[in-house]
Amino acid sequence: MVNMKASMFLTFAGLVLLFVVCYASESEEKEFPKEMLSSIFAVDNDFKQGERDCAGYMRECKEKLCCSGYVCSSRWKWCVLPAPWRR
């Protein structure tokens, strides 16, 4: 009974180790963290670079009007999605 528990534990530990090694080598190849950060900032830059006279989702709407499809929250003064319970 002890041998079976030990062998199951070693098998599980080996699979976890294999997963970690494969993930690490794949991450190095793809440079996952850099790609993720650059994609996040690229989306943010699109909003900054584009000439807009409206505010997008979760942007302040005190001075700007919200873009189409959004409404200005009277409580928080952010552009949010319209919902039946919001007025």
Curated annotation (Swiss-Prot):
Residues 1-24 form the signal peptide. The keyword Disulfide bond applies. PROSITE patterns: HWTX_1. Its main location: secreted. Expressed by the venom gland. Keywords: Disulfide bond, Ion channel impairing toxin, Knottin, Secreted, Signal, Toxin. GO terms for molecular function: ion channel inhibitor activity; toxin activity. Pfam families: Toxin_12. Disulfide bonds join 54-67, 61-72, 66-79. InterPro entries: Huwentoxin-1 (IPR011696), Huwentoxin_CS1 (IPR013140). It is found in: Secreted. The keyword RNA-binding does not apply. It comes from the Eukaryota. Residues 25-52 form a propeptide. One of its GO terms (cellular component) is extracellular region. Ion channel inhibitor. The presence of a 'disulfide through disulfide knot' structurally defines this protein as a knottin. Belongs to the neurotoxin 10 (Hwtx-1) family. 51 (Hntx-8) subfamily. Hntx-8 sub-subfamily. This is U3-theraphotoxin-Hhn1a 16.
